[in-house]
Each structure stands twice: as C-alpha cells, then as structure tokens.
Design a protein with these regions (language model features):
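Substrate-positioning beta->alpha
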Residues: 50, 77-84, 89
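Glycine/proline-rich active-site loop of Rossmann-fold NAD(P)-dependent oxidoreductases
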Residues: 61-62, 77-79, 93, 106-110
Length: 172
C-alpha cells in the first residue's frame, strides 16, 4: 500500500512529570525519578522503549544504530525526562523517535507515521480506531474497524459493528 519504507517518525509525549519535576520534594519522592528504583533511565526507559518497539514492529525493520540526545532539568536529578533519537534501520531507512514526559498538557500521546515511496500511514494511541493512509495523489483515507473494506484478518479481530470503540465489548 505505501511501497518501500523510506522514513519513520514516532513520538510518545506525556506531561505527567511536569508538575512534579519543578518541586524538589516531589522530585525526590517519585520512584520513576529515583535511579535506585527506576534504573538509569526515566523517560526512555519508561515510554521510549514502547516507541522503539512500535518502530520495529510496524515496519518489520530492525534498528541498526541510533544517536540519542537526552534531557534532564535539574542537577540533583539527572534522570532523562525528555529526548530525541535519530534512528537508522535496515536497508538505510532513517527515522526519528521523540519521547517526553514534560510535554505540558499531553496525556498519553503515542503516535507513529511510516512513509513509503507510494504513501504513508499514521496511527495514534489516543485515537486507536483510526488508521490514516496517505497516497501520492494527495487523497487521505481513514480506515476504522468493522467495515467490509478491511482485510479478513482485521475483520476477524473485530467483534462489534463500525463505530464501537475496540475493547469496550471486553470491558463491559
């Protein structure tokens, strides 16, 4: 549908650490910001790993090398809370991974776009029932679950008619 993969762009933005990070007492009492409890990484170890996995899973290509620029705000807490990563994947495909837990106002914004030589795909975790497909001719298509235009594999995983959010059936 999109042809040969040429570019991948994934971001995972949250804002939950923003009100905590500016208060020294809260900073020191939050386990995610404590390297003895959380390990050597905060943002990348927490959500960056999910974004990284999304790149490899979605494209089917392995990351072969990367260059990361990680950010912390206070000398007394050098856990990364934000970062940008340049990716090189198999076949020379380039990508960008951006993750932040100080993106003010963001909730759980995982988003991936994969661009090929004939089109592109975009999916957002906060709008999981929509897959955006762009093509060379400029047409934007929006795919949602439960429609006959979906593949047999997709239809086999859908329990309800179009318009029902996936997972609601299981939650009730």
């Amino acid at each position: 549908a999109i042809g040969k993969v040429q570019k991948v762009d994934v971001q995972y933005y949250q804002g939950w650490i923003n009100p905590i990070i500016h208060d020294k007492d809260k900073r020191s009492s939050t386990w995610r910001l404590d390297p003895t409890k959380a390990g050597i990484s905060c943002c990348m170890g927490d959500i960056g790993t999910h974004a990284f996995n999304m790149v490899e899973y979605t494209t089917g290509l392995r990351v072969t090398s990367l260059l990361a620029d990680l950010n912390y705000l206070y000398e007394d807490n050098q856990m990364d809370i934000d970062g940008n990563v340049l990716l090189r994947l198999q076949g020379g495909v380039k990508g960008v991974l951006r993750a932040s837990q100080i993106a003010t106002g963001e909730e759980n914004g995982l988003k991936i776009s994969v661009y090929g030589d004939r089109g592109g795909l975009t999916w957002e975790q906060e709008n999981p029932n929509r897959l955006l497909v762009r093509s060379d001719d400029g047409a934007l298509q929006v795919y949602t679950p439960g429609h006959s235009y979906n593949s047999a594999l997709s239809l086999g995983g859908t329990k309800l008619p179009p318009g029902h959010p996936e997972g609601i059936f299981d939650a009730m």
